[in-house]
Structure formats: structure tokens, C-alpha cells
Amino acid sequence: MQACMVPGLALCLLLGSLTEAKPLQEYDPYAEPPAMPYWPFSTSDFWNYIQYLQTQGAYPQVEDLARTFFAHFPLGSTLGFHVPYQED
């Protein structure tokens, strides 16, 4: 019985280190949400940057740029940013 447990335990430890599994973080009520990025340009600037980056094939940069731009709209909370309440 112990002969099976020792290799089984070693296998579990090996597989755990290979998968780089991390424990789930518990909810921390005092953790600050990430700061909302700053976008000082106009909407047309945004689309010009998107078109330029697409011609260059820089799709990771397009995603970062879109995340920064759209964080300023009410859907920013779905991107992981805290968006303050805005009156219409």
C-alpha cells in the first residue's frame, strides 16, 4: 500500500509544478482596482492609430490601445477597471 502512495504523491507534486497551478485569490475588500488609463486624444485619433497598427500587424498593441480607450466608457467596468458613476 505504501509502495503505491509514495510514487503517487511524487507524481502529484511533479504534475503540480509542471502545470504551474496557482491557488485562487480570495476576495479582498480593501484591494484597490487598477487605475483607469488616461486617453487625452479624440475618437478619430483612436481609429487612426488602430488603422496604422493594423497595417503594421501589431495586434497586441491594438488590444492595449482599445483597452485604454474603452475604459473611459461605462463598459470599462467589464474590462477590469472601476468606472465612477456618470450622470447623463
Swiss-Prot record:
Function: May be essential for the survival of the neurosensory epithelium of the inner ear.
Known tissue expression: Ear specific.
Protein's UniProt name: Otospiralin
Gene Ontology cellular-component annotations: extracellular region
Highest taxon of the lineage: Eukaryota
Taxonomy of the source species: Eukaryota, Metazoa, Chordata, Craniata, Vertebrata
Family, per entry: Belongs to the otospiralin family.
PANTHER family membership: OTOSPIRALIN
Signal peptide start and end residues: 1-21
Chief location: secreted
